[in-house]
Amino acid sequence: MMTKTESLEKMREKGAYDAQQLQSKAAAGTVTQTEIIDEEIAVPAFDPKKDYSAWPVNSPVSDEDQVWLLLQPHNAANYEGRPSTLRALWGLAHTKNPAKAKPFVAPYGTSGMYMKDECILWTDGKVYVSVADNNVYTPAEYAQNWKLVE
């Protein structure tokens, strides 16, 4: 029988393996952003001291209740901020799964625009789905671009 310490070590190893597998699939483009968010438990947390220079583009991290995808490999210790404030380095992932909807984050230029069928969790606690591609508006700003998920 395993000790508690051994069990925890096995769980850490499994978590690291799952994170590496998801990172590989994301970098290869063999999973969608929806699938990445569906497997968010395997997404590593953003570390502001980590060197992401050797990480492949599209590798996911979680931060501030969002999943971010690496756009530009870099050493985070050389930058002040988080993915939400370093949008030239990190892109926002979106989901088409209403059960995993994330809070709305304003797009940054063309990065992070909401495409048709992508979902958000709005400030009223309700889930909305975009009915238009290249959607940069909130449900409050341009309601016709969003449909309430019942």
Which role fits each region the language model picked out?
Residues 2-150:
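Tryptophan-rich substrate-binding surfaces of secreted polymer-degrading and adhesive proteins
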